Design a protein with these regions (language model features):
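Short glycine-rich, Thr/Ser-proximal phosphate-binding strand/loop in the N-terminal lobe
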Residues: 1-31
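A generic structural motif
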Residues: 6-11, 52-53, 108
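Electropositive phosphate-/nucleotide-binding environments in soluble metabolic enzymes
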Residues: 10, 30-38, 92-96
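Glycine-rich loops and low-complexity Gly/Arg-rich segments
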Residues: 15-18, 37-40, 81-85
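Short, well-ordered amphipathic alpha-helical segments that serve as non-catalytic structural scaffolds
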Residues: 35-47
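Short beta-strand-loop/turn "lid" adjacent to the catalytic site in phosphate-handling enzymes
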Residues: 44-91, 117-127
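Phosphate-binding/catalytic loop of phosphoryl-transfer enzymes
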Residues: 92-127
């Protein structure tokens, strides 16, 4: 799932899908990072957006250590944990990693949220 927000308004969203054949090419979930990042960037371009249009990037989820719901800056430790997948291999582990790669290319901040209520809280903070 991807979405672009302008402050608190969800401007556009999509559910990008991948075939079983595409996914089967990868041994680990983290190996899918570049493929999924490229799909998101291609989708943005198709919709008329560039990385320079972004002010921040937010990923969602990941099987991380126990922590309260909320918004967290993506750190090197968080990235290490998401790649190592100590808590399990899951596509949600890619949320913070993809956000980090896109933010790095755009030269902007990157964050990860734990759940849907964290997203709602983040939107409220932006109002």
């Amino acid at each position: 799932k991807v979405a672009l927000f302008k402050r608190t308004e969800n401007v556009i969203q999509n559910n990008l899908t991948h075939s079983a054949e595409e996914i089967a090419k990868f041994e680990r979930v983290s190996d899918q990072l570049e493929m999924r990042q490229a799909l998101i960037e291609d989708w943005m371009k198709e919709e008329g957006y560039q990385l320079s249009d972004l002010e921040a990037v937010v990923g969602r989820g990941g099987l991380l250590r126990s922590m309260p719901g909320g918004t967290y800056e993506v750190t090197s430790k968080m990235k290490e944990d998401l790649i190592a997948a100590h808590r399990g291999e899951h596509a949600s582990n890619l949320g913070g990693l993809i956000a980090d790669k896109i933010a790095e290319k755009a030269g902007i901040g990157v964050y990860n949220i734990k759940n849907e209520s964290s997203l709602k809280n983040l939107i409220e903070l932006l109002k």
